[in-house]
UniProtKB/Swiss-Prot annotation:
This is TPT1-like protein. One of its GO terms (molecular function) is calcium ion binding. Belongs to the TCTP family. Residues 6-140 form the TCTP domain. It comes from Homo sapiens (Human). It comes from the Eukaryota. Pfam families: TCTP. One of its GO terms (cellular component) is cytoplasm.
Amino acid sequence: METVIMITYWDLISHSEMFSDSYMSQEIADGLRLEVEGKIVSRTEGNIFDSLIGGNASAEGPEGKGTESTVITGVDSVMNHHLQETSFTKEAYNKCIKDYMKSIKGKLEEQRPKRVKPFMTGAAEQIKHILANFKNYQKT
């Protein structure tokens, strides 16, 4: 029997699961940033029929009718890892990323002090790149 190992990437600050190695990703700027490929997908949620519900269906409501279904469209890697898309303006993103970078800097000072200066320099360049291309990112 072959053992399969899946690598899961976690956020250092929030400890949220971000994505797994089942998605194509690439390191940018010596690992300062990861880009993860995702596809826009649509999924139907809901649509549970009486035959799948235990108990007395006639006492629960009209017989033979399923619950309402909803079609949800989004990026597969976001939906599969239960992440929430944001709808930042450029200004709101800039404020949020500055606060986040302060948190990252604090973690690095605790755990890898020699990494602080190169990380902060490289991250500033990457943030400039993201802000310059902000219009190209999906906003819901």
